[in-house]
């Protein structure tokens, strides 16, 4: 199950990709630590749920945005009967160092090799941010529960 989660984490966690009003997308790295996970067994497939704490490195963020942010993320993933990842949804909630609140959501699909995320809503600088796309990959697998990822903007 931990290998499945490693794959799902890479596919699903693109909320660290941001679009600031009047700015282009910016790429970033993020570190995730699993805090809980659960597998619900079905006959023809399974549902994997996980929660993680993420630290987002926004070094290339536009002026006025913090250079780092943290979030709690929740993932619900559909697996085949052989426990291979198929698709899923995620959402992340965050209060940044400036006190601005944001809620992010998205979906991913293995067949399409995609993860699409958007800002559901927020306050302050997040009020006018919009949807974004990025390519995700794992840079370092530190342990079964900790990974460093990269989210590269698709412009």
Mark where each language-model region is:
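Beta-strand-enriched cores of mature, soluble protein domains
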Residues: 21-155
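Sec-dependent N-terminal signal peptides
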Residues: 4-14
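Sec/Tat signal peptide C-region and signal peptidase I cleavage site
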Residues: 15-21
